[in-house]
Design a protein with these regions (language model features):
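C-terminal motif of bacterial Sec signal peptides marking the signal peptidase cleavage site
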Residues: 13-16
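Exposed beta-sheet edge and beta->alpha loop/turn motif
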Residues: 125-160
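Sec-dependent signal peptide recognition
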Residues: 2-8
Length: 179
């Protein structure tokens, strides 16, 4: 009889402990949900915008490729080079696609649209689209280059890209462009 009473008491204690844990967890969740997160997932439509831009670049449809850019857009490379303004970006990429790059393809693309609510450093608040893709470019001189590229796009309040930061290995491009 003592064994049965002991087992019943242990079971009751265990069940009561479980109920308390559940109550505390739900309190924590409700407090956490009311706090604005520093960053969160953004609308998947931004990934679709990015995917379409790569398709346009592959086709050489640079006018359609430029549709996503704001007039005040800035295009920056990790080397420190940059293009300022939609006109400068269009001029550079149209010339490059028409006269330097014979064909270009993007494979194994990864897209991550995020909404930055509280910047950690110098990045702007708002929607950022982070992307990674394997790029193969064939140049008009017959040489080819393949590398992984990481590109970050920032969208303004009307869903136009106002900042691009692209991380590339220029040494691979320069080598492929040499005769």
């Amino acid at each position: 009889m003592k064994k049965i009473a002991f087992i019943v008491i242990c079971a009751v204690l265990l069940l009561n402990c479980k109920k308390e844990d559940t109550k505390e967890t739900s309190k924590v969740v409700s407090i956490t949900d009311s706090i604005k997160k520093p960053a969160e997932f953004a609308d998947p439509k931004y990934a679709e915008i990015g995917k379409k831009s790569l398709v346009d670049m592959e086709k050489g449809d640079m006018d359609s490729w430029m549709d996503i850019y704001a007039d005040n857009a800035v295009y920056v490379w990790n080397s420190g080079d940059s293009l300022v303004g939609k006109a400068a970006i269009a001029s550079y990429w149209k010339q490059r696609r028409a006269n330097v790059i014979e064909s270009i393809s993007f494979k194994n693309t990864i897209w991550l649209p995020i909404l930055v609510n509280q910047p950690q450093s110098i990045e702007s608040k708002g929607v950022w689209l982070l992307s990674w893709y394997k790029t193969t470019a064939k140049y008009r001189n017959g040489n080819e280059m393949t590398q992984w590229i990481h590109t970050d796009y920032h969208f303004d309040s009307i869903d136009k890209v106002d900042r691009v930061i692209q991380y590339i290995d220029k040494a691979l491009i320069n080598k492929a462009m040499s005769k």
